[in-house]
């Protein structure tokens, strides 16, 4: 198992706060969203896999945004549009 450090991740992310948000979103995708990891799982927890993906430059904010757009539920989006209409 390769050890991942914050410094490795910060080479691809602007600051620690953005790193926390990005790794949290990606770990949640891996754990509950049914997304496939882009690196070998190696019996790690989703958080570690997410950090390894970030450290290798595979996962970025743009990657997460694209994944969220693709997985958006069209039924929920239609319901949300109906509720946002002016009365």
Curated annotation (Swiss-Prot):
Q: Which GO terms describe its molecular function?
A: DNA binding; DNA-directed RNA polymerase activity
* Documented EC number(s): 2.7.7.6
Annotated Pfam families: RNA_pol_Rpb6 (PF01192)
Catalytic activity entry: RNA(n) + a ribonucleoside 5'-triphosphate = RNA(n+1) + diphosphate
Is this entry keyworded Transferase? yes
State a GO cellular component annotated for this protein.
DNA-directed RNA polymerase complex
As for family, the record states: Belongs to the RNA polymerase subunit omega family.
The record's subunit annotation is:
The RNAP catalytic core consists of 2 alpha, 1 beta, 1 beta' and 1 omega subunit. When a sigma factor is associated with the core the holoenzyme is formed, which can initiate transcription.
**Known function:** Promotes RNA polymerase assembly. Latches the N- and C-terminal regions of the beta' subunit thereby facilitating its interaction with the beta and alpha subunits.
Q: What is this protein called?
A: DNA-directed RNA polymerase subunit omega
Species source reads Pseudomonas putida (strain ATCC 47054 / DSM 6125 / CFBP 8728 / NCIMB 11950 / KT2440)
* Lineage of origin: Bacteria, Pseudomonadati, Pseudomonadota, Gammaproteobacteria, Pseudomonadales
User: Gene of origin?
Assistant: rpoZ
